[in-house]
Amino acid sequence: MSSDLKQTPLYQNYVDRGAKIVEFGGWAMPVQFSSIKEEHNAVRYEIGLFDVSHMGEIEVTGKDASQFVQYLLSNDTDNLTTSKALYTALCNEEGGIIDDLVIYKLADDNYLLVVNAANTEKDFNWILKHKEKFDVEVQNVSNQYGQLAIQGPKARDLINQLVDEDVTEMKMFEFKQGVKLFGAIVILSQSGYTGEDGFEIYCNIDDTEKIWDGLLEYNVMPCGLGARDTLRLEAGLPLHGQDLTESITPYEGGIAFASKPLIDADFIGKSVLKDQKENGAPRRTVGLELLEKGIARTGYEVMDLDGNIIGEVTSGTQSPSSGKSIALAMIKRDEFEMGRELLVQVRKRQLKAKIVKKNQIDK
């Protein structure tokens, strides 16, 4: 493995715990600690912990911060509060998704954008390029933050025991600042990437290991990127670089809820997204279940039963929960019909599949 890979503050901790390390977006990250299936099931049925400190954090501050983030992002940021985060997209002029991200309003003139690890530099440069007309400061503060995700049906009860705040009623994308956890001051966000209840914890980078080790004392399973991928795929959650790209719009990528082109404010890509909202996008993302043995991998062709190509697989795996072979695919809009049978070209075979809902959590 290349010695040029970036490491999170927990790298040596993974190694000491016997994790299998892989390259991901320029980082050395654990793909698994025990087994992907064991870690997956821990999150689906109990509780698991992920290090996501490789994610990027970009801070926007200044007098025009609120107008600037709205100009950059496809969702309506005007109603953000200092306790409610928002999932949104950073789009180009054609409506293509440069990145999908979560924005936190930390104060009236202070916003934190949490972006995908592989896109941090690209996003930062894009934001810098568009800030000229706004009175704002933009900083890449990724090296100041550690980020952990504690996920699973038992996560809320555990966090409630450990923090000095009541998190019982916290809803999706609500967050609290200034929360004390193992002596560290953190941002606690009710969010995740698994389809389960849970929290994402933002801390000072120097506190990351203390919090990680502290949580693992409570019968919490450490989990790697392998389980993170199978969990998000079962939940029908897209991955940027596969299911979302700069040539895929929110309406094509299945995140239409993150696009609000009818608001008064202007934003980059608005005209294209307004047209797609009103008239439909040329393609759409669907869930697939293979009806024959095989795994649908990224880039595999999707065909109708006559062998005509109508799209391609963007992500696929075998579901540890159901044992089924599941996928997300991008197909022509007019070819969509729930339950319809299709073919997927898996190596030299054409395997039958059917269109199903994207969220395929089965437990």
From Swiss-Prot:
Pfam families per UniProt: GCV_T, GCV_T_C
Keyword Transferase recorded: yes
Gene Ontology molecular function terms on file: aminomethyltransferase activity; transaminase activity
Taxonomic superkingdom: Bacteria
GO cellular component: cytosol; glycine cleavage complex
Entry's Gene Ontology BP terms: glycine decarboxylation via glycine cleavage system
Protein name per its UniProtKB record: Aminomethyltransferase
Classification of source organism: Bacteria, Bacillati, Bacillota, Bacilli, Bacillales
